[in-house]
Amino acid sequence: MAYAAYRGMKRCAEVSGVPGFIARGVSPSDGKGFYLNSSRDTFSLFVSGMLAFYRHPFADAQTRAEIAKMLVDVARYAEACVVPKNDYSLLRADGKASIVCRMWVPDPNEAPKVDATGWARVGGMMPHESLRLPMFYAAAHAVSGDARWRELELRYADDGIRIAEKPIGSNIRGSELGQLQLSVRLLWECETDAGRKARYARLLDRCADMA
């Protein structure tokens, strides 16, 4: 069952032909069709799941090599996409502007401007959003050992932690709390700095208290 899930996730990483792009899913009718726009949730769940597979006993050397390549591809894709000209967002598979894929903001100190639907479409980041990007780079570093990814992780991690530590309203969606938890858990597992690891641990405790 786990290996079947892995093969399905791997297909989502390969179907577009764009290294690092993760499709939401693949059409069961032909095994080729997919939606051009992905989402931050899709990428985050993929990265978290693939690192878990990488560390699982079922993963042989070939599987771990495949996972390492996919996670590094995601990190490269994020590095290329998450820049000012793209509104700090992951792009669609065709290279056009996306929706629900904003990964960072010009000023991490700016407060988010939340609309009537509860989304922060402009301004700063919400607590559950802020650790996705460093999580991608942490996973790439964990499987490759390439210091470049650790450097990129740390470029965003401390601001991300500070934002995640801000008060979270009781109306937070369960899916949002879950996204925060999986990002923080991956970062906590990978972190070697004692002070930063302790802050991640406190964030995990808060997620548990709110669940």
What does each model-found stretch correspond to?
Residues 1, 45-63, 132-146, 180-196:
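Well-ordered alpha-helical scaffold segments within catalytic/enzyme domains
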Residues 1-12, 58-81, 145-164, 195-211:
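Extended, well-ordered alpha-helical scaffold segments
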Residues 1-122:
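Extended ligand-binding groove/face enriched in aromatic
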Residues 15-20, 166-170, 211:
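Boundary/linker segments of alpha-helical solenoid repeat arrays
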Residues 33-43, 61, 65, 123-127, ...:
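Alpha-solenoid helical-repeat scaffolds
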Residues 122-180:
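Beta-propeller domains
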Residues 170, 174-211:
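Extended, charged low-complexity segments
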